Amino acid sequence: MCLIEMQDVWKTYPNGTVALQGIDVHIKGGEFVYVVGPSGAGKSTFIKLMYREEKPTKGEIVINGSHISRLKERYIPHMRRKIGVVFQDFKLLPKLTIYENVAFAMEVIEASKKEIKPRVMEVLELVRLKHKARSLPDQLSGGEQQRVAIARAIVNNPDLIIADEPTGNLDPETSMDIMETLLDINKRGTTVIMATHNKEIVNNVRKRVIAIEAGRIARDEQKGEYGYED
């Protein structure tokens, strides 16, 4: 089943910069896809279009049967409930505990307290941080904070995880730990799309690679290589 379809997608910013042009992509449910390319090639725009942080200038984007490029603003929060996003800089709430950070994602969709506690503890166990539930973010390492961000992204059982440079601020060992967590989530059936500059991970853990150069798709390969010297 096709989870994501992009058909002739273009993005031009108000200053005239053409970030993406003529993008055609089909991603099946359950895939793990790397998005690679030089800095400024359009990777971030490509990723942001999928959760409607950006809107295409032209073209169609369909995710799980929903034409998100046509969605009215009031429907976007509901659409995003089916998508988990993991950022490079974690974006945790500093004054909330780890448990509270993850629970907040469920509170936003008005889940009951009866539902929240067992589910939050379940995902914290999945990312191996159940023992840190009462800790604050600044008491955790960078890798641990990113695992909390992943727990928050998956707590509402999304169909899709979008990870934008999730290992960008981490050392090689911690980066591989984060990668293993994302692979585990993918094995459970969740589609994962990961924008990255991490050559070692892409070349050592072979998955589908979509390479973007100058706003266009330059390569789309199964078990592809990174292909750049950063």
Model-predicted segments: where are they?
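Helix-to-loop junction immediately C-terminal to a conserved catalytic motif
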Residues: 51
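Conserved ABC transporter NBD signature motif
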Residues: 59-67
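Short coil-to-helix segment of the ABC ATPase nucleotide-binding domain corresponding to the Q-loop/switch region
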Residues: 96-104
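Conserved ABC ATPase signature
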Residues: 135-140, 144
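Conserved catalytic motifs of ABC-family nucleotide-binding domains
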Residues: 157
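Catalytic Walker B motif of ABC-type/P-loop ATPase nucleotide-binding domains
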Residues: 161-164
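Helix N-cap at the start of a conserved alpha-helix in ABC-type nucleotide-binding domains
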Residues: 172-174
